[in-house]
């Protein structure tokens, strides 16, 4: 995994609450266990007018020119609810999103997001409403996120957010569960060498 310390990107306003994981990546596309290839199916039933995904829905925000290169998603409360599929953050990151900002997230999605190096930022509803107003007035605006300082710069306003210190550390240093384990490889090897032969 790569280090994630700062990110600046165009903001995509998805003005919907309770966006569930089936809306993020419909179940018919969950036929792989690798993380790549899901981006083209992100929000499939909203992005496209046909099952084959060949006719973009011009009314959906991701198909509108100011937002087509977006990498920061702005949403309403309870984002990522529904089933506990890891494919949901995989689809978001494979599409190109690095950050999702919302008043609240479903618990399982929130944890899965960090595992996929997708940063979920929680702000209160008044702050989220102000951000939607800002993006509506300036389509294509970019926000800047600083993971180390836990700040979000949106226009002339700087917001602060809180991350669990361990999750923040893992993002900054590009560590997942495997990377954390490998940091202790020598200690693991020493332990294995001391074990009785019949247990090896």
Swiss-Prot record:
One GO process term, biological-process aspect: L-leucine biosynthetic process
Keywords: Amino-acid biosynthesis, Branched-chain amino acid biosynthesis, Leucine biosynthesis, Lyase
InterPro entries given in the database record: 3-IsopropMal_deHydase_ssu, Aconitase/3IPM_dehydase_swvl, AconitaseA/IPMdHydase_ssu_swvl, IPMI_Swivel, LeuD
GO CC annotation, single: 3-isopropylmalate dehydratase complex
Catalysed reaction, written as an equation: (2R,3S)-3-isopropylmalate = (2S)-2-isopropylmalate
MF (Gene Ontology): 3-isopropylmalate dehydratase activity
Record pathway: Amino-acid biosynthesis; L-leucine biosynthesis; L-leucine from 3-methyl-2-oxobutanoate: step 2/4
EC number of the protein: 4.2.1.33
Keyword Lyase part of the UniProt annotation: yes
Task of the protein: Catalyzes the isomerization between 2-isopropylmalate and 3-isopropylmalate, via the formation of 2-isopropylmaleate.
Family statement: Belongs to the LeuD family. LeuD type 1 subfamily.
NCBIfam families for the chain: leuD, PRK01641.1
Xref: PANTHER family: 3-ISOPROPYLMALATE DEHYDRATASE SMALL SUBUNIT (PTHR43345:SF5), 3-ISOPROPYLMALATE DEHYDRATASE SMALL SUBUNIT 2-RELATED-RELATED (PTHR43345)
Record's subunit section: Heterodimer of LeuC and LeuD.
Protein name from the UniProt record: 3-isopropylmalate dehydratase small subunit
Gene: leuD
